[in-house]
């Protein structure tokens, strides 16, 4: 299966530079649905509605706002955001190596694979092997899609994996969650230890499946055999019709609804 790259550049540290491509390591297996109109099966479209003026808002009148209190916002323009946005990274520059065992999994965000590009295969394999033997990971800052990430680059099954990490101020404290220490009977401790020992097994994710997703897919396959899928009607677009005309039409509908309340 061909995997589409979402970024290409180099991974570097000291005098080493390896050309790589970033690809997704996880394909989310959720079953997604579109919302349809039950009368004609047309896919429903999302529109922006202003409750104050009771009208649809065209794209050129939509801005961002940062909420600073109940019903209080600080407007901000695209130009202002662009002025503080970091430049897109061309290099994943490792600033230090760490022991991966020291990284609490709660800091893990999204995993990606780093695929070697032409000319970088030998250095790539060498880095994979060294990091595997030492169980070390490279720590770096990396900009993707106008967001600056903290990332860990590690060796996984013969390949380099890049894991985006949460920043420390994003991880919530467990101080209010952990129960206070108390006296636990020796037989209770012994029983828990025995249960854990009896249930020990090697990690094998292939033993488990998303049963709900599988049942939904079976349901869909059954429905396809029993009943042909419906087709949404073609929407004829009149000459000159565009977003402004659509908004005007929707506003007219809203006015009619208000009259009939």
Curated annotation (Swiss-Prot):
SUPFAM superfamilies: SPOC domain-like. One of its GO terms (biological process) is double-strand break repair via nonhomologous end joining. Residues 12-171 form the Ku domain. Disulfide bonds: none annotated. Pfam families: Ku. InterPro entries: Ku70/Ku80_beta-barrel_dom, Prok_Ku, SPOC-like_C_dom_sf. Transmembrane segments: none annotated. One of its GO terms (molecular function) is double-stranded DNA binding. It comes from the Bacteria. Keywords: DNA damage, DNA recombination, DNA repair, DNA-binding. With LigD forms a non-homologous end joining (NHEJ) DNA repair enzyme, which repairs dsDNA breaks with reduced fidelity. Binds linear dsDNA with 5'- and 3'- overhangs but not closed circular dsDNA nor ssDNA. Recruits and stimulates the ligase activity of LigD. Belongs to the prokaryotic Ku family. Homodimer. Interacts with LigD. This is Non-homologous end joining protein Ku 1.
């Amino acid at each position: 299966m061909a995997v589409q790259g979402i970024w290409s550049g180099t991974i570097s540290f000291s005098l080493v530079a390896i050309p790589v491509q970033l690809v997704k390591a996880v394909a989310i297996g959720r079953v997604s649905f579109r919302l349809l109109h039950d009368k004609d099966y047309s896919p429903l479209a999302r529109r922006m509605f202003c409750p104050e003026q009771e009208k649809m808002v065209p794209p050129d009148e939509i801005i961002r706002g940062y909420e600073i209190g109940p019903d209080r916002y600080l407007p901000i323009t695209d130009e202002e955001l662009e002025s503080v946005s970091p430049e897109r990274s061309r290099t994943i520059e490792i600033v230090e190596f760490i022991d991966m065992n020291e990284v609490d999994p709660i800091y893990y965000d999204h995993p990606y694979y780093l695929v070697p590009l032409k000319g970088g295969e030998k250095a790539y394999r060498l880095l994979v092997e060294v990091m595997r033997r030492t169980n070390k990971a490279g720590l770096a800052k990396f900009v993707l899609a106008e967001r600056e990430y903290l990332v860990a680059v590690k060796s996984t099954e013969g390949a380099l994996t890049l894991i985006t990490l949460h920043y420390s101020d994003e991880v919530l404290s467990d101080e209010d969650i952990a129960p206070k220490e108390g006296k636990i009977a020796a037989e209770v401790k012994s029983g828990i230890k025995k249960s854990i020992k009896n249930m020990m097994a090697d990690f094998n994710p292939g033993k488990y499946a998303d049963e709900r997703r599988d049942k939904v897919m079976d349901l869909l396959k059954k429905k396809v055999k029993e009943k042909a899928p419906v087709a949404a009607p073609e929407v004829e677009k009149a000459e000159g019709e565009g977003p402004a005309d659509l908004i005007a039409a929707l506003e007219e509908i809203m006015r009619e609804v208000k009259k009939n309340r």
